[in-house]
Amino acid sequence: MRALPKIHRRGPIECERKGLLVGKCWERSQGVPVARTLVEVARLAGVSRSTVSRVINDDPNVGAETRQRVWEAVRASGYQPHAVARSLVTKRTHIIGVVIPELVTALFTDPFFPILLRSATESCNEHRYQLMLSLFSSSADRQEMYERLVGNAYLDGVMVASAALDDPLIPDLLRDGVPFVCVGRHPDPRVRSVDVDNTGGARMAVDYLIRLGHRRIGALTGRLDTAHGQDRLDGYRQALTTHGIPFSEDLIVEGDFTEGSGMTGVQRLLPADPSAVFVASDTMAVGALRALRQGGVEVPRDIALVGFDDIPVASTIEPPLTTVRQPIGRLATLAVETLLDLIEHPGSGPRRMVLPTQLVIRESC
C-alpha cells in the first residue's frame, strides 16, 4: 500500500492571504493536499465520499484495507470529522462522563481520583471517546448536572465513582435507561460495577497485624455510607473473629478518606490504647502519621499502622507505609471497557467484577 507523504499545514489567515477558501483549503507540500471535507479525503484515499463517511462512522461492513487507507488519509491531511454531524448519523456523541460526588478539592487532596482519571482518559482515547468530568457536592448541583448532561442526551454513558449507597443519582440513571457503571460495589443487582476486593484486602491487613502479635487493633474507617467504607470495616471484623479477638466499639472511629480525618481520627483512637491501627485509606494514614509525629508517638515503635490503596506517597513517607495495594489504573480501564460494552450492547446483563488486592509490607508495622 502506497504510504501517504508528510504534509505541511498553514493556518486560516495564511490561506486567506493566498486567496484560498477557508474551510475548504487545499494546500500542497510534497504532493499531498490538506483536506477539509469528506470529498477531499475521499480523493486523497482513492475512494468514494460515502465510503469515507462509513469508515468515520464505524460501519463494520467496510473492508480492513479500505478502512486503513481512509484513516491514513484522515491523519495525513488533518481532516477533523464534524462531531455534531457524526452524532446525528450514529445517534452517539462519543463522550462519556465521569461523575464524582465530591468537592473539587477532592481531586487535589486524594491521589486516588487523579490516578483513576488518568487511566480512564487513556482508555477513552484508545477507543476514540472523549471523557467529561463532573463533580458535585449537593443535591442542587447534582440535579443541574443531570439535566444539563444526562437529560439532554449529551453523554453516551456515565461512570460513577465513589457514590454513597443512597445517592439518588443511581436510581435516576436506572429510571432513565442511561448506560452507566459504578466504580465500587452497589447493592442494587441491576447495577453494573467494577470493584476491588475491599473486604479481603482489609482482612489480609489486619490478619498481618495479628500475626505480628497485636491484639488491640484500632480501625480508622472511611465513610460508612459508601460500599468500600463498609467493606473494609467488614474485613477488619472478619480478621478479628477468625483469631478469636472480640470486637470493641471504642476501637472504631469513622473518617471520610481525607488527610484531616486521619489526623483527628487517630487522636480520638489513642485514649483506647491500641497497639496498632488499620487505616482504611493511605490519605488518612498520612494524616494519622502526621498527628502521631506531632504528639511524640513513634511509628512503629509505639504504634503500628497499615493503610489501604498504595498511592505513590505510601512508599516515600517516613516511615514507608505498609498498605493494601489496589490496582487503581486497571480499575479505571475495566470501568471504561465495561461501560463501552454496555453502550454497544444495551441488552447485556449487569454484572459485578472484582479485582484482587495485595499486601505491600514496608516499615510502619
Regions found by a protein language model. Give the residues of each.
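N-terminal helix-turn-helix DNA-binding module of bacterial transcription factors
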Residues: 2-95, 365
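Flexible loop/turn connectors
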Residues: 4, 8, 268-365
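Amphipathic helical "hinge" segments at domain boundaries
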Residues: 32, 79-145
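Short beta-strand segments enriched in small/hydrophobic residues
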Residues: 51, 91-106, 208, 216-222
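Hinge/beta->alpha junction and helix N-cap segments in small-molecule ligand-binding domains
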Residues: 103-115, 133-142, 194-204, 220-267, ...
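Short, well-structured alpha-helical segments in soluble
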Residues: 142-154, 262-272
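Flexible loop/hinge segments that line or gate small-molecule binding clefts
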Residues: 161-204, 245-246, 283, 309-321
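Short acidic capping loops at alpha-helix termini that bridge into adjacent secondary structure
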Residues: 215-217, 247-251, 299-304
